[in-house]
């Protein structure tokens, strides 16, 4: 969605967008929000000011989709290699492991892993344009590009990954 308009001395654009994509694997999706504002103001015959700003936020629910083997197997590799004749859980309610390949995770257990990534970015510029005399324009630009990312991962003890440590949680943050 966007709105544009203005007058002889003011021009503006405001826009926003939302996008959601579900993955082909259960519990895997992505949402993106973006917003943009452009504003230009003619202050006088000699001075123009302007601001352009874009803000985006991406949220992703990840599942193990890597190309590793054994305990690092992706959910697709684990599903392809796991014995389909075994029940999902044993009589104790624990995920069944293949006795001939105990290093291979039960693919259903991988769906219990919580792996969320959130990214935000602000990209902004501002300018001042001055025309002190005919045929001379002075323009100063100022800008910022700010990124933030946070990834939260939880592997419950019911998964092969978390079993070794009684469950594991990690948070990584970049600024």
Regions found by a protein language model. Name each.
Residues 13-15, 50:
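Periplasmic plug
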Residues 7-8, 44, 131-133:
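Outer-membrane beta-barrel channels and translocator barrels
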Residues 1, 23-28, 34, 38-121, ...:
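Surface-exposed loop/interface segments of Gram-negative outer-membrane beta-barrel transport/assembly proteins
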Residues 120-123, 133:
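C-terminal intrinsically disordered extensions
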Residues 136:
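An active-site-proximal structural segment forming one wall of the substrate-binding cleft
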Residues 16-22:
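Transmembrane beta-strand segments that form the barrel wall of outer-membrane beta-barrel proteins
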Residues 2-4, 15, 38, 125-127, ...:
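Outer-membrane beta-barrel architecture
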Residues 5-9, 18:
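A generic beta-sheet turn/junction motif
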């Amino acid at each position: 969605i966007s709105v544009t308009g203005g007058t002889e001395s003011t021009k503006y654009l405001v826009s926003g967008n939302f996008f959601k994509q579900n993955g082909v694997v259960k519990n895997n999706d992505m949402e993106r929000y973006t917003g943009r504002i452009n504003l230009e103001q003619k202050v006088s015959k000699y001075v123009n000011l302007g601001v352009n700003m874009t803000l985006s936020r991406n949220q992703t629910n990840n599942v193990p989709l890597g190309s590793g083997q054994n305990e690092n197997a992706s959910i697709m590799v684990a599903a392809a290699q796991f014995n389909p004749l075994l029940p999902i859980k044993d009589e104790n309610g624990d995920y069944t492991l293949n006795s001939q390949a105990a290093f291979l995770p039960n693919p259903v257990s991988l769906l219990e892993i919580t792996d969320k990534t959130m990214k935000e970015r602000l990209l902004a510029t501002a300018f001042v344009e001055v025309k002190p005399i005919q045929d001379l324009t002075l323009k100063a630009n100022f800008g910022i590009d700010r990124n933030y990312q946070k990834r939260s991962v939880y592997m419950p003890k019911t998964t092969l990954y978390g079993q070794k440590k009684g469950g594991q949680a990690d948070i990584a943050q970049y600024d």
